[in-house]
Amino acid sequence: MPGFHLNEMGEMVLDAIDDIGVVDVYDLASDIGKEYERIMDRFGTDAVSGLMPKIINTLELLEALATKNERENATIQELRDKVAQLESEKLEKAEFRRRFDKELELIEEQWRSETNELVDLVSSLQDENKRLVKQTQDLQSSSAQSSGLGASLTESIISMTNHELHSALSDTQVLQRLKEQIYKQRDELKHRERELQDKYSELEHLNIQAERLKASERDTRRRHKLMQAQVKTLCEERADFLAQLQDQSREINQLRKRLGLAEKENEDLVASYDDGQNDPNRPRYTTRELKELISERDELLTTIDTLNEQLAELKPPSQAKGKRQRHFSSSDDSDEDDDGHVADNDDDDDEEEAAAEANELEPPAAGETPPGHDAPVQGPLPYEPDDAPWKKSSESGIRKFFRKLFSDPSDGSNTFPKRSLATLSKMALSATPGSVSASAAAK
């Protein structure tokens, strides 16, 4: 068994308290029952009479604890699976959050760098614009001082203006390129957002699958519990079947003994019949003739008694008393003569048959069954089935197991008498179920 093992001394040792179940408890109870049978066969029932109720209470308590242990182990396993699932979800979310933060940091860094470039470009353009404005003002002031230099100054102004226009065009192209980059990055951000939404939807789908798996796991555990309950029921039925097999074997042994006795009696009767045919003193009268003679004798005795009573009434009291005494003595003598005559004609077997027939002819006493009528049924009533609906009780499976194991046998095949096993069965079931709860509360 998974919860126990035998050491070198032959003692049963507990392996792991977390692995013990109800089936292990019933196996242990079966082993204890076998040990009790060996002890009772060797030392008798008195050696275990005080220990049996304590052992039964202990096994009931162990059965309750094993059932509670199975429920707690199932609950702990469910909680562990839930914790593992939550931890895996937490790690997945943390990894996804870390990647998302990293991508956001990269995008934000790129945006900062581009923004700084644009700010530097704008500041440089503003400086160039200020320089051009100042240069234009200087040219206008110098044009008032020297008019002769107007043509050359005009050409220089035109060339400078063309140069500024060319630089402005180049700056515009740069700005246009930057705008295009900004639009491109915006599109990329939108694409990343769509990918993020897809990841979220995929995560939701995985969560739904996880819920389905959890539901299937709960269903599997429920089926496992049902299977455990069926195994427990099968163990109890197995114990019932073993007890029934033991009862049947005892009944078979008893029937075999009765058959042997009947065969022996039959042989004795056949032998006595053969001896009676050769016996010269065998009965000369049939049963019917002997019955008629006895009935006729009884009628005559009754008539004599009636006539003596009538005669006593007609005579004086003193003569009636003496006559009555003489009548009693004469009747006794007549009875002795009749008995002697019967003894001379019949043997001892005829006398026994005559006495039996006389007893049959006598009127029945008060409370006795008259001849020709069936006698009332006597003896123990048949046993009621254990699965009768009116016999449902709240006793534990351990008590039922020991009730079947130590049931009162109906034969004498065992080494100890019937009453001892019956006493042991009652002793094993003497402890009330409340004692188990009391002992559990004490622990």
From Swiss-Prot:
The record's function comment reads: May have a role in lysosome distribution by interacting with Arl8.
Q: Which family does it belong to?
A: Belongs to the RILPL family.
**Gene Ontology BP terms:** cilium assembly; lysosome localization
- UniProt keywords, alphabetically: Coiled coil, Lysosome, Membrane
List, in alphabetical order, the Gene Ontology terms for molecular function in this entry.
dynein light intermediate chain binding; GTP-dependent protein binding; small GTPase binding
Q: What is this protein called?
A: RILP-like protein homolog
Q: Which GO terms describe its cellular component?
A: ciliary basal body; cytoplasm; lysosomal membrane; perinuclear region of cytoplasm
Q: Where in the sequence does UniProt note compositional bias of the Low complexity kind?
A: 356-368
> Quaternary structure per UniProt?
Interacts with Arl8 (in GTP-bound form).
Per UniProt, residues of the RH1 domain are 8-96
Mind giving the lineage of the organism this protein is from?
Eukaryota, Metazoa, Ecdysozoa, Arthropoda, Hexapoda
Q: Which PROSITE patterns match?
A: RH1 (PS51776), RH2 (PS51777)
